[in-house]
Amino acid sequence: MRILITNDDGINAPGLAALEQVALELAGPGGEVWTVAPAFEQSGVGHCISYTHPMLIARMGERRFAAEGSPADCVLAGLHDVMKDAPPDLVLSGVNRGNNSAENALYSGTLGGAMEAALQGLRAIALSQFFGPRNYGRTDPFEIAQSHGVQVIRRILDTWPQERPDYRLFYNVNFPPVPAAEVKGLRAVRQGFREGTRFSAEPHLSPSGKRFLWIKGGDQQQRTAPGTDAAANLDGYVSVTPMRADLTADDALEALQATL
């Protein structure tokens, strides 16, 4: 198997190194693992692409490249430059430092990379590590990905539905905020929403008197509805959510069509 890897935390991120080891086991002796990751931190950039300016790309190793762009840019660089002669069988994005459950998925550069791969017609999986009081500050923050990642990805691949040209499917995987030994299993769930908590802009003054803003996230430990990703994670389960690049609200569309 030929695998392309990217992330949004950057080429030197520990989560990327963990995913590279997972990918090497998945690829097998005859396979190849290629990495094209951002040269700098790209967290929160979503699915943005840098179509207004050129993107520098540098070789960091035999099959490792750093691109000065977003995760989606890196996927494009991998498909149309680095691996143009033989495209990958699978694209993996992560392992993100922090959860991409619930509404976080809408901001995530990690998911942006996977979504771009799906739009390009490839199988893609985004992987993220949820942190909380039970696993924060551990010696190996990505131990769950290393111990469970191969099994999780293989199970997803084994159940991947037959692809349709109009159905750009990818998967969002979140590892729970517990030690690896306490993971209870996998749950297939919907994307959730953390009610009453959201991003905000917090004003501050610099020592020189200039006004600036910090963007602050909401309460990441807040439980979402039963049967959704963050709820499963807080209960100790790896969440797996199938997604596709179609943001249509079908229920609202039906109501709108009935009145227009």
Swiss-Prot record:
> According to the UniProt entry, what is the EC number of this protein?
3.1.3.5
- Identify the main location: cytoplasm
The answer to whether the entry has keyword Cell wall biogenesis/degradation is no
Localization (cell): Cytoplasm
Q: Where does a divalent metal cation bind?
A: 8-9, 43, 96
Q: Which UniProt keywords apply?
A: Cytoplasm, Hydrolase, Metal-binding, Nucleotide-binding
Catalytic reaction(s) noted: a ribonucleoside 5'-phosphate + H2O = a ribonucleoside + phosphate
Query: Matching SUPFAM superfamilies, A to Z?
Result: SurE-like
The Gene Ontology CC terms held by the record are: cytoplasm
Name the chain's protein: 5'-nucleotidase SurE
